[in-house]
Amino acid sequence: DTRYPATLLNGVALRILAEREVSRGRAAILKAYYTKLAESTGHEHPDIPEEVLQVSLNPDATNVPYLLGRLFSVLEAVQAAANPGINATIRDKYFSGASATPAAVFPVLVNLAQKHLKKLNAANRGLSIAYEKQMTELLSKLGTEYPAHLNLPQQGSFQLGYYFQTQARYQKKEEK
């Protein structure tokens, strides 16, 4: 029942930031790290929110880094829907900054998303409304201010929130 070394979390987080991709394997390593840490500390650790220990998207989550990751995924989906076939997405340009310094990046991304929603509304009003509803729900849970910085464990929560929200979107597409 020993913890995984912090270098494991650091290494995975750096790979995610460098490649801007949270793969299934990386998400599994993040979850394993947090699960072991929770077991060794008796779930009484400030950097282990309950959402991180879940096996799928937790729509009732209140953990700010997790919610920010979910919001980033929705913003990425809005951009992709408004600009099909785009070469560089917000993930390519903003993922690292959004997961480390949300206060500097998210106001820009939300502003961009409003423009994307306007464009999408002209092409597909129903999809535009659905994305706007998701954004509004997440933004209301986040409150009025974004955190200036996220530490490494919080970045892991962000990355898992992003991963689970993205996977939930793909599952919905497969069910249709």
Predicted stretch roles:
Residues D1-K176:
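Intrinsic-disorder/low-complexity detector
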